Amino acid sequence: MITLQINKVPTLFIKPFTAADVDAIVDFVRNSASLYSGSASTVLFIDTPITTATVEAIEKLSSERFRVVFRDHHGIDGEPANDREGRVVAATRKLELLLGSDCRITVRRLHPACSTLVSVGEFEDAVAIVADRDADGLTAAMKAAGISYPELDDDAAKLDGEPRFQVTGSHISQLLAKGMAVLPSYDSSKPKEREESQQRLFADWLKAVSGNKLAIERLEERVLLYDDAVKTSETLARTGVEVAPGVVLVDTVDKPLFDPGTLDALLENDPGCRITVVRKSVGPIAAIHGIQYSLSVAKRYQGKVNLHDLVPVDAKSDPEAGIISNVSFLLHTSADVWNNQVLPALRG
């Protein structure tokens, strides 16, 4: 998890999945409240995945003196297609019943970025903000706390979109996107390395938005790393192998740092490529299972291909289970799930 003060508002960036995550959220809010000098009791959850852990944390905080406001765009668009989506719908209903008008859950189609769900400074007096630990969570939290710039909403939508479009926003947005692209992947032998690097990136970017020259210089150093990663991606793209009709796999195990957005874009230049797969030894699933397979549906096929169809309908999105998937066009699995479920399904 990452913690920052954004315009004096304590902010926690976290993806809640476990009981430990619930405790971390509740403890963070309680600690923030103990240092809070205002009279408000509001805690904002924004761009937070609608998981069982998220609901549990909100239930605990609501049972205390806190007024919880929930804003998010991870709702299910239409009828649930599988058990995972069914659980999201059930959790959504729980939150709506618990929070009433303080709960606003929409879908990405209507709100590509969560920053569009708040006005500038709407929660500048909040006790705390809890957000997803990605660029969309950061931009939404900073806007809620009172820091913004003219292109923020458009930039946020790109930052939360496909990797290849994340670097196409304003110059300040590109500094964040390229910095995110070259963060060290999660390594179980150095479990804090990625988190600490991301915390420094977020802190520098917030300063850069306000014009801090030293922070901008540090971000531009990350851009040099990004440029090298792009070159590596170009080399890796030439090693792609079709493992099923329209499915191209690239093995990046023990390879230098690469940019996923560039790699995907190069692979998708082939009109027959429906799904890209990256095999890697780092990431939240790899940290537990050793190897991780990351699948992404090519943009032109996203209305036709649902990756949730490749795993059992009752599959749980959890690194321990070897599956992570919050949207239909992205799926991360362990080697066991890939070999025994996903690859056979792709080959039909």
Feature annotation, model-predicted:
Residues 190-193, 198-207, 212:
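Eukaryote-biased recognition of electropositive, low-complexity segments
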